[in-house]
Amino acid sequence: MVRIRPDEVHSSLSRNILADGFGLVVDLDRSHGCRIHDSRRDREILDMFSCFATMPIGWNHPRLVEQEARLGRIAVNNITNSDLYSVEMAEAIETIGRLAKPDHLPHMFFIAGGALGVENCLKAAMDWKQQDRTRKGLPGDDDHPHVSIAHFEEAFHGRSGYTLSLTNTDPIKTDRFVKFDWPRITNPTIHFPIDETESARLDEV
């Protein structure tokens, strides 16, 4: 097995991938709660990133660590859960449905990943809108094929399919890809301190 020291991680990754992430090296064992342990500099950092909010309960939550062996056994096989079912999947869905699913919504839909999550929300919104227009006797896509999704400037929603038309943080992330010309709204951010220049900018927003 290859062994790499924390101070070698970035140089090693750079030989094979675009390694432009943060300058720290996460210690998967010593990170805990809302604290990342950086093994590159042997320090703890307050985690206000939470991996784009995909880790809402923090690092190494005790209840998850208790199930480490079970979770590891399940994770060995990356099953296509839409096609192949297991007892473990049924138990997970039953638990999530009992604790998190609102009574007025009969079904759940699961997506792994932020961009695909955004993309499926867009598809659900488009589907709902077209069904709503049909119920009202209004023209559908055949007569009005252009669907617009309003979104903020400075937004990053991913780089897959529809999300390319929403992402606009850095042109290099979306250049050379076909995109929809959807309306972009000024991001109503506030820059501190609020001086005369900032007040004037806010008035324009």
Task: List where the protein language model places each region.
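N-terminal glycine-rich, Lys/His-bearing helix-loop that initiates the first secondary-structure elements
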Residues: 1-104, 178, 195-197, 201-203
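PLP-dependent aspartate aminotransferase-fold enzymes
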Residues: 94-205
